[in-house]
Amino acid sequence: MKKIRKGDRVVILSGNDKGRSGEVIKVNPGESKALVRGINMVKRHQRQTQKQEAGIISKEAPIHLSNLAIADPKDGKPTRVGFRMNADGGKVRFAKRSGELIDG
């Protein structure tokens, strides 16, 4: 089970966007990287296609998972993730900082 998943709210721990938070759009476990909405924006030169105009566009660049931490559901501060078994025998994630469940 992965600690960071698509849709999670994360806090950036290092880099230009340190301290900012955003939602995970995509996780690439093979490269240990994730895309976070509105974070680590880079400019790309776009070639013209039938659907898009040419020009310079801003898009998210991947961030290494070691530079991300789950935001605590209680107060939004960075927390580590733990796993515990629920009553049904399924594995659920919880915030070690507050004990709150991350999986609804």
UniProtKB/Swiss-Prot annotation:
Gene3D superfamilies: 2.30.30.30. InterPro entries: KOW, Rib_uL2_dom2, Ribosomal_uL24, Ribosomal_uL24_CS, Ribosomal_uL24_KOW, Translation_prot_SH3-like_sf. One of its GO terms (molecular function) is structural constituent of ribosome. It comes from the Bacteria. Pfam families: KOW, ribosomal_L24. GO terms for biological process: translation. GO terms for cellular component: ribonucleoprotein complex; ribosome. Keywords: Ribonucleoprotein, Ribosomal protein, RNA-binding, rRNA-binding. One of two assembly initiator proteins, it binds directly to the 5'-end of the 23S rRNA, where it nucleates assembly of the 50S subunit. Part of the 50S ribosomal subunit. Belongs to the universal ribosomal protein uL24 family. This is Large ribosomal subunit protein uL24. It comes from Bartonella bacilliformis (strain ATCC 35685 / KC583 / Herrer 020/F12,63). The lineage of its organism: Bacteria, Pseudomonadati, Pseudomonadota, Alphaproteobacteria, Hyphomicrobiales.
